Regions:
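Phosphate-ester processing/binding pockets and catalytic centers
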Residues: 1-225
């Protein structure tokens, strides 16, 4: 009787996509290449996520992602050097297009992007924006969002309010099939205690079922619900 959408986010893929955005793309931009044209960034992130462990070595690839997260978080010369060393410790010559900017060149433009104070690897806002863009398409009228309590989302509360308050007509098209129009039909975003919200409890059950189904479909797990 009610419209619903279940949104599954592969956080590992999203982390790899961020790696491509900050540790790869600036190298190509500096050389006049539009790395975002035709979804090249998504293609490389997909290739790295699926084939990276095999081509680069599983432990080394895992260490690279850990070093990237730490480098983005700490932004110190030592953390950045550890990231470059981690890239060089992989079998990067198997995929030089992706790892060369760090492993071969320690490209200053990439290191500068990673050290930028405004850059982090928090996926909360990315996930919420994607979900909002989908809900905007599904809903016929105004709506509000109740979210389980999250310290990460609290960081973006003021930004979300600015999204909601934007009253000028404009459309942003992220891909051929994804766009978001302002003003939003979203009226409010609030955090609630899941223990006091049957709706959030039901959403938790749906999320668990969706994850279980996704694991079964991809072969990561069998059986389940």
């Amino acid at each position: 009787q009610y419209k619903s959408v279940t949104y599954i986010c592969d956080k590992r893929f999203l982390l790899v996509l961020m790696f491509v955005d900050y540790a790869v793309e600036p190298f190509y931009y500096e050389r006049g290449v539009d790395f975002y044209a035709n979804g090249q960034n998504y293609a490389m992130a997909s290739l790295l996520t699926i084939a990276g462990p095999t081509l680069l070595g599983q432990p080394a690839f895992d260490n690279l992602l850990i070093a990237f997260q730490n480098g983005v978080k700490e932004k110190t010369p030592a953390a950045i050097k550890t990231l470059v060393d981690a890239a060089r410790a992989t079998q990067w010559r198997q995929l030089p297009e992706a790892l060369g900017p760090l492993a071969q060149f320690a490209a200053p433009e990439c290191l500068k992007a990673i050290a930028n104070p405004g850059v982090d690897t928090d996926a909360a806002l990315v996930v919420l924006q994607s979900l909002i863009s989908r809900m905007e398409v599904m809903t016929d009228g105004n709506y509000r969002v109740e979210h389980d309590q999250s310290k990460n989302l609290l960081r973006y509360h003021e930004l979300l309010l600015r999204f909601i308050d934007h009253d000028k007509d404009i459309e942003f098209r992220q891909t051929q099939i994804t766009s978001i129009k302002f003003p939003l039909k979203l009226m409010e975003v609030s955090q609630v205690d899941s223990k006091a919200s049957p709706a959030v409890q039901l959403a938790d059950i749906m999320i668990g079922a969706a994850i279980e189904a996704a694991n079964n479909i991809t072969g990561l797990r069998s059986g389940g619900l």
